[in-house]
Amino acid sequence: MTKSTMVRDLAADQTITGYFLVHEKEVRNTSSGKPYLRMELGDSSGTVEARMWDQFEAAKDVHRDDFVKVSARVEIYRNKPQLSLLQFRMAKPEEINLADFLPHTAYDVEVLFKEVLGHAEGMKNPWLKKLVLQVLSDPQIVGRYKRAPAAKVMHHAYLGGLLEHVAGLCGLAKQIATHYPELDVDLLLTAAMLHDVGKLDELCYERAVSYTTEGQLLGHIVIELETVSRAMDEIEGFPANLKTVVQHILISHHGQYEFGSPKLPMIREALVFHYLDDMDSKLAAVRAALASDSGEPEWSAYSGALGRKFLRLEEFLKEKEPPKETK
């Protein structure tokens, strides 16, 4: 069945009936102590908060990653659409088309992966080349590497987003190494290809993007440090000092302690890679905000990832009338 009501199309004062994926569900209490149901619902176009104030006993059988059919009133709360649920039920399997609920990259993942492998094959450092090709040929990794999102919310938060992010970083690494020839481009490429490999185990993404228990307890930096260290140990003769450098770039790529890195970047390439990663991530979040139909003609909707809204520059600079020619 084709889904007709999408999150991106929700507008104030609508009464809607539609199918959504449950991202979160919890029972909270109002300030007066009265319980109410709060859910985060979503589809491939985005997520929306939903609340039900009375008679939500049926919710006890609803869990994260379930599909539900809801009837609701669309309200605006803090400048964002919110659903006031009237009723809901579990959706039937034949009512659901998974493609409506899984946002995915606009690029062909096989083309992206071939592009990344091309960067790996062109590396001059034999140890780093062997390392990345070994990791990217691991049957336990390669399929998930092509499918995984890069994050739950912050950036490239859709299927294939991780690979899209990696391919973009590889291109940026080569460009910046051309401008700054003192940089070791193979180290930057290694970081680009392996810096988020821990997200394959940090995130689950069969229906909605969420965190695994391992992801919540360890985080992707710890997971990928173990994965990549194990791969280096399996390569006979891998230089110990080079192993330390790779490990440092991986654990420092978030750039600051408060963002999850246990060490600040203390190698030139580690610092550069942190900024490349941060720039690509933030621009992806800006792109997503500007691409959304919500917001105003000249302004995007508020971006939770970046804590602001963005000016639609082309619309702002558009000439309302062409300038008159002067004689």
Where are these regions (language model features)?
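Divalent metal-dependent catalytic cores for phosphoryl transfer on phosphate-bearing substrates
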Residues: V153-H155, E164, Q175-D293
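Acidic/His-rich, divalent-metal-binding segments that scaffold phosphate/diphosphate chemistry
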Residues: E95-L217, A240
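Acidic, carboxylate-rich catalytic segments that either coordinate divalent cations
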Residues: E269-K327
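Structural detector for short beta-strands of small beta-barrel domains
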Residues: Q14-T30
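OB-fold single-stranded nucleic acid-binding module
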Residues: K25-P35, V48-R51, Q55-A99
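Divalent metal-coordination and catalytic microenvironments
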Residues: F20, D65, L169, L250, ...
